[in-house]
């Protein structure tokens, strides 16, 4: 195992070394992390990285296949957009742990902050302690296991995936409901806990999307061949895809805001108002 000292190297230099060592199949020990941000970001090799202390924001973000073991605490966004691989946090985690993971396994032995598993798509986020508010916020898939209490508004605006809670469910989020837990699901969770040597003998409650707020009054047609007015100027932004998108949104009266699936109504673009402005 090769040692990297963050008391001597910057995070940028350390991450370059981590990726180079990973390409050679070397496991890595990171000492004196001092809660520095972005440790291990971008690693895509099946090696083990041990962080001997606390890590800061977005540790193990944008990684694939690697396994991280963090001895103490971690800041916001641990495992951000992690594809496969794993992260084990021996202490607590800050807000949005497991944000947008796509298959990774993240285990937090302490408590975790708000909006855990936000927009996650696949994989498992497990918290041995308690969660803060809105765990599973807008999650699209995967599962969250909380062996402590859920925190308020668990499952807020989730569209898919499952949340399992052993402790108290403080309150359900918008469009979330509690449902029955199948025996196969229960067994699969216990096998996962055994894999990470987590002792658990209690029972679990299952939370899923209720399916009451996933429909708009007017559906957006999935059609590619849509006429639109062309733009004669010289602009890289005003391309055919943008024009098509604006045409679709003008028909349904709703335009998506980039980031986390938000939407807002289009303003009224009446002819009279346009003429008035021209005058």
Segments predicted by a language model, with ranges:
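Structural recognition of beta-strand segments within beta-rich domains
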Residues: 50-51, 70
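Intrinsically disordered, low-complexity terminal regions
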Residues: 1-39, 90, 109, 124, ...
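Hydrophobic transmembrane alpha-helix bundles
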Residues: 67-69, 100, 119, 195-197, ...
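Detector for repetitive beta-architecture
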Residues: 27, 36, 46-48, 56, ...
């Amino acid at each position: 195992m090769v040692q990297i000292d963050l008391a001597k190297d910057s995070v940028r230099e350390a991450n370059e070394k981590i990726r180079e060592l990973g390409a050679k199949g070397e496991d890595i020990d990171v000492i004196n992390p001092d809660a520095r941000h972005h440790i291990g970001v971008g690693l895509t090799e099946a090696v083990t990285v041990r962080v001997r202390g606390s890590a800061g924001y977005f540790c193990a973000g944008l990684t694939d296949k690697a396994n991280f073991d963090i001895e103490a605490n971690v800041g916001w966004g641990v495992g951000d957009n992690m594809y496969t691989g794993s992260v084990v946090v021996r202490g607590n985690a800050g807000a949005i742990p497991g944000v947008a993971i796509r298959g990774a396994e993240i285990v937090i032995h302490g408590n975790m902050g708000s909006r855990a598993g936000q927009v996650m798509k696949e994989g498992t986020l497990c918290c041995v302690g308690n969660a803060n508010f809105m765990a599973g916020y807008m999650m699209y898939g995967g599962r969250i296991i909380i062996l402590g209490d859920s925190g308020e508004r668990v499952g807020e605006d989730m569209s898919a995936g499952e949340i399992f809670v052993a402790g108290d469910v403080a309150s359900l989020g918008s469009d979330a409901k509690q449902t029955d837990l199948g025996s196969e699901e229960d067994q699969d969770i216990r096998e996962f806990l055994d894999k990470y040597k987590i002792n658990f003998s209690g029972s679990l409650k299952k939370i899923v999307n209720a399916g009451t707020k996933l429909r708009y009054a007017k559906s957006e047609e999935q059609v590619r061949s849509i006429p639109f007015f062309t733009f004669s100027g010289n602009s890289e932004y005003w391309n055919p895809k943008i024009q098509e998108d604006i045409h679709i949104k003008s028909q349904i009266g709703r335009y998506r805001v980039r980031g986390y699936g938000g939407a807002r109504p289009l303003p009224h673009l009446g002819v009279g108002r346009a003429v008035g402005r021209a005058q």
